[in-house]
Amino acid sequence: MEHAEHGNSNAPMEYQSETGRLNILGFWIFLGAEIVLFSTLFATFFVLKNRTAGGVLPDELFEVNLVMIMTFLLLISSFTCGIAVHEMRRGSLKGVVIWTIITLLLGAGFVGCEINEFVHYVHEGAALSTSAFWSGFFVLLGTHGTHVTIGIFWITGILIQLKKRGLTPQTSSKIFISSLYWHFLDVVWIFIFTGVYLMGLGGL
């Protein structure tokens, strides 16, 4: 049971403390609850997707270029987040900080685009109360966008800890856990991109 030993130097840094291992396990359980949450929101959206109440239709408002930019920003941020974890395992504090900051900037760009998108839709007459479709749309995407925003603040806090404490098994487990969270949000976005935007643009 070598892997269960406290301070196993052969394991990745984030697994080298018992606390880190337990925190990672606990976070996987938390992600299970998040999967249930988003599955419920997706199911609700698909039930409501044809109930536009004679109002503005998604294919009249969805902008391909903006959606592609948002997708590009979030997927590239997943890649840079992965590089940050790689740099962490190499023991490079500078590399972790640089790639994490890039990830945060990309995430902030995504949130900015989404806010701009929502403002545009409301201006064009598509608001939360316009129809059942738009209610499902704003709740689903708003929940995802809120999660991304929370992630940005959370990871910023981890960066501050890194500056004070450096790379330790404790800070490394936090970096790894935040990367799981970030990758999860990217996966959710792929489903949003496919199930909401592509189907909406296709009039499905």
Swiss-Prot record:
Pfam families (UniProt xref): COX3 (PF00510)
InterPro entries: Cyt_c/ubiquinol_Oxase_su3, Cyt_c_oxidase-like_su3, Cyt_c_oxidase_su3-like_sf, Cyt_c_oxidase_su3_a-hlx, QoxC, Ubiquinol_oxase_su3_dom
Annotated GO biological process: aerobic electron transport chain; aerobic respiration; ATP synthesis coupled electron transport
Subcellular location: Cell membrane
Membrane topology per record: Multi-pass membrane protein
Gene Ontology cellular-component terms listed: plasma membrane
Enzyme class: oxidoreductase
Entry superkingdom: Bacteria
Gene3D superfamilies, sorted: Cytochrome c oxidase, subunit III, four-helix bundle (1.20.120.80)
Major localization listed first in the record, in broad terms: membrane
Catalytic activity: 2 a quinol + O2 = 2 a quinone + 2 H2O
Residue stretches spanning the membrane: 27-47, 66-86, 95-115, 118-138, 140-160, 184-204
Keywords: Cell membrane, Membrane, Oxidoreductase, Transmembrane, Transmembrane helix
Family matches, as PROSITE patterns: COX3
GO terms for MF: cytochrome-c oxidase activity; oxidoreductase activity, acting on diphenols and related substances as donors, oxygen as acceptor
EC numbers on record: 1.10.3.-
Transmembrane is among the record's keywords: yes
PANTHER family: CYTOCHROME BO(3) UBIQUINOL OXIDASE SUBUNIT 3 (PTHR11403:SF2), CYTOCHROME C OXIDASE SUBUNIT III (PTHR11403)
Free-text function comment from the UniProt entry: Catalyzes quinol oxidation with the concomitant reduction of oxygen to water. Major component for energy conversion during vegetative growth.
UniProt family annotation: Belongs to the cytochrome c oxidase subunit 3 family.
Name of the protein described by the UniProt record: Quinol oxidase subunit 3
Species: Bacillus subtilis (strain 168)
